[in-house]
């Protein structure tokens, strides 16, 4: 964690044009209209917004560019888009529709040159490498999974993260598949291993169940930002109260 202000980032997982949320990447339930949700989150002090088209990569569908454009027209906070980005042309199209950053997951792993070329053209500041990991007990290590968690790679997670950084990724969006949607808290050991080994910001994802979990991710896990979906989508906690909890624990946040 750097000395910068900690960021709270709601994530819109999009399927068939709707916001959805599941547990461990399955059992998806409808959580609302993405454009409406984006506007509400901005009003409620979100620092950034993340939009992930969760079926684009696996179904090989084109990114919902029209939806990206509508959300970008609605909000003024930084806006990251991922899902189905496979080429530099895809990166260009998403940025031209109003995204500030792009998030690449499966395609970056399968074609690491995509990170290299995209960062050379558009700058590392707008390239987020999304990494989905699961702890493999038999090998006692975290490993990379692709296609929304459906494809096992066998590659050690931090090894791939280091390569991604070397190729120009400006941030790592780190999701624990073991914790995703469980609301049992972030995987602190995973966060610490990444934040202590990498020089770029780490966005913690997977497991947020309450504001205290987010405080823990920043203070103990040394994450630079926390990303959450279900606890915000269904209204149990607001971003404002999450930030107040952070502030009470001495974390610098934006509250105006």
Swiss-Prot record:
It holds the Pfam family His_biosynth. Keywords: Amino-acid biosynthesis, Cytoplasm, Histidine biosynthesis, Lyase. The active site is at residues 13, 132. Gene3D superfamilies: Aldolase class I. It catalyses: 5-[(5-phospho-1-deoxy-D-ribulos-1-ylimino)methylamino]-1-(5-phospho-beta-D-ribosyl)imidazole-4-carboxamide + L-glutamine = D-erythro-1-(imidazol-4-yl)glycerol 3-phosphate + 5-amino-1-(5-phospho-beta-D-ribosyl)imidazole-4-carboxamide + L-glutamate + H(+). GO terms for molecular function: imidazoleglycerol-phosphate synthase activity; lyase activity. It is found in: Cytoplasm. It comes from the Bacteria. Pathway: Amino-acid biosynthesis; L-histidine biosynthesis; L-histidine from 5-phospho-alpha-D-ribose 1-diphosphate: step 5/9. Its EC number is 4.3.2.10. Heterodimer of HisH and HisF. IGPS catalyzes the conversion of PRFAR and glutamine to IGP, AICAR and glutamate. The HisF subunit catalyzes the cyclization activity that produces IGP and AICAR from PRFAR using the ammonia provided by the HisH subunit. This is Imidazole glycerol phosphate synthase subunit HisF. It comes from Leptospira borgpetersenii serovar Hardjo-bovis (strain JB197). The gene is hisF.
């Amino acid at each position: 964690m750097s000395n910068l202000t900690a960021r709270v980032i709601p994530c819109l997982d999009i399927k068939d044009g709707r916001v959805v949320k599941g547990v461990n990447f399955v059992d998806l339930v409808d959580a609302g209209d993405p454009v409406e949700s984006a506007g509400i989150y901005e009003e409620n002090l979100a620092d950034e917004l993340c939009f992930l088209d969760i079926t684009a990569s696996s179904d090989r569908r084109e990114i919902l560019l029209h939806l990206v454009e509508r959300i970008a027209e609605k909000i003024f906070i930084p806006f990251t888009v991922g899902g189905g980005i496979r080429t530099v042309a895809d990166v260009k199209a998403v940025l031209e529709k109003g995204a500030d950053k792009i998030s690449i997951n499966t395609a970056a792993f399968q074609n690491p040159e995509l990170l290299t070329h995209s960062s050379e053209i558009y700058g590392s500041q707008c390239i987020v490498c999304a990494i989905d990991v699961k702890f493999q007990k038999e090998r006692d290590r975290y490993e990379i999974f692709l296609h929304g968690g459906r494809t096992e790679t066998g590659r050690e997670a931090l090894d791939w993260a280091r390569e991604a950084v070397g190729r120009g990724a400006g941030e790592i969006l780190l999701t624990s598949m073991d914790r995703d949607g469980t609301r049992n808290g972030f995987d602190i050991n995973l966060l610490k291993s990444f934040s202590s080994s990498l020089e770029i910001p780490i966005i913690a994802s997977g497991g947020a169940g309450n504001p205290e979990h987010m405080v823990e991710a920043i203070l103990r896990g040394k994450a630079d930002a926390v990303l959450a979906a279900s606890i915000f989508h269904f209204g149990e906690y607001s971003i404002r109260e999450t930030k107040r909890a952070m502030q009470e624990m001495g974390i610098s946040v934006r509250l105006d």
